[in-house]
């Protein structure tokens, strides 16, 4: 470029000015890609057996990685005993949208579950779709860890948008997808119901393995029902008829 260098200094050399890329403009830049680009430039000025050996090593490693392998195929599935096995099911004539977490696997389990959202965006895609489809209501899956992290904002957005949606909060007290760590922060089922009620959720139902373990003074928000897990299908059919945002804590 004129004026870019001091008088008497070597002229600058532009690489890629005519569409010949030194490095790929898109995708991943691996150490091997960068090493080959540097070696190609150096080879114009200096020939080295060491450089040739290192390039041959990189070629051999990548060829080994690219070699086809025969392996048994196993589709991922929920762990035995995980509540997601049941909680991600919806009535046959209903639909659900997926989110971040192990429950994402319900997308390929024939459970009328589609789409993927980022963490904290569960159900938000429905806010844009709802006004352009004949479908009145959907379910949205959300884990308890996601809820505490950022999922509550998605529910708040749904309340503000006045759409018909039922969030299924899949409470398993663990971040199972990354090793079973406990969920950060204090987050009990009664606390969740009080927070949701304060956000303007129309109706909240808790499905518990043993509803009797929750006494009357457990601290649930007013009007919250606690029912057995066996009522899942019936409760979902009730909630989908309720206008506005509803929540099922499973």
Placement of each model-derived feature along the sequence:
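Cofactor-pocket helix-loop regions in the catalytic cores of large enzyme subunits
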Residues: 42, 46-109, 149
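Gly-rich Lys/Arg/Thr-decorated short loops/hinges at beta-loop-alpha junctions or inter-strand turns
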Residues: 14-17, 66-75, 103-112, 135, ...
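General beta-strand structural signal in soluble alpha/beta enzymes
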Residues: 14-17, 53, 96-99, 140-141, ...
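Conserved active-site and cofactor/substrate-binding residues in soluble primary-metabolism enzymes
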Residues: 25-37, 74-77, 82-89, 120-124, ...
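Thiamine diphosphate
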Residues: 85-89, 95-177, 184-190
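Glycine-rich ThDP/TPP pyrophosphate-binding loop and its adjacent helix/strand module
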Residues: 1, 174-250
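Hydrophobic alpha-helical scaffolding
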Residues: 1, 16-32, 72, 77-84, ...
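Terminal amphipathic helices with adjacent charged low-complexity linkers/tails
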Residues: 1-53
């Amino acid at each position: 470029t004129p004026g870019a260098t001091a008088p008497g200094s070597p002229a600058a050399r532009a690489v890629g000015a005519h569409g010949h890329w030194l490095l790929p403009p898109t995708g991943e830049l691996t150490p091997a890609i960068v090493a080959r680009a540097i070696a190609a430039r150096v080879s114009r000025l200096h020939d080295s057996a060491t450089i040739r050996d290192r390039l041959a090593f990189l070629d051999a490693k990548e060829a080994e990685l690219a070699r086809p392998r025969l392996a048994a195929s196993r589709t991922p599935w929920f762990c035995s005993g995980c509540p997601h096995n049941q909680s991600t099911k919806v009535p046959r004539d209903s639909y659900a949208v997926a989110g971040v977490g192990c429950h994402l696997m319900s997308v390929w389990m024939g459970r009328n579950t589609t789409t993927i959202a980022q963490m904290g965006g569960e159900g938000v895609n429905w806010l844009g779709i709802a006004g352009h489809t004949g479908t009145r209501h959907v379910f949205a899956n959300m884990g308890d860890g996601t809820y505490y992290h950022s999922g509550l904002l998605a529910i708040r957005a749904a309340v503000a948008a006045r759409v018909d949606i039922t969030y299924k909060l899949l409470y398993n007290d663990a971040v199972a997808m990354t090793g079973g760590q406990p969920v950060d922060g204090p987050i009990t089922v009664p606390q969740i119901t009080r927070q949701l009620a304060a956000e303007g959720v129309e109706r909240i139902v808790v499905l518990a393995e043993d509803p009797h373990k929750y006494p009357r003074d457990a601290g649930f928000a007013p009007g919250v029902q606690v029912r057995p897990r066996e009522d899942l299908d019936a409760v979902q059919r009730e909630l989908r008829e309720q206008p506005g945002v509803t929540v099922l804590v499973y």
